[in-house]
Amino acid sequence: MFFYGTLMAGFDRRRRACIDDRLHYIGRGAIPGALFDIGLYPAAVPAPDGHVWGEVYETSDAPRVLAALDEIEGYREDDIDRSLYRREQTDVLLPDGASARAWVYFYNAPLGRAPRIASGDYLEYLKGR
């Protein structure tokens, strides 16, 4: 799993409390993409010209964790067009230079005039606001 927004450490994680015991923190990582500020949380979209920084986790129970995250992120496997986010497996670059595959929730709605977060790092961005 790759978290780049309010599911990361440092935020109120009550929304993910039901799966915390099934997640094992691996470390920071980055995916190819662009990050935007859409208000209460960020939105990542695939993009070849940038990186989105976040946290990488392993899970001991992928079906249960994905079901919970699908609910949190508004992802409907049977109706992707109406989903707020879409779930995709993506390559994540780890700090040691290795890469891993992880599930990522990409924003699936119009961005409007949302400002791009140039650093791709939501935590860093919030510290500067």
Q: Which role does the model predict for each range below?
A:
Residues M1-R129:
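Glycine-aromatic micro-motifs
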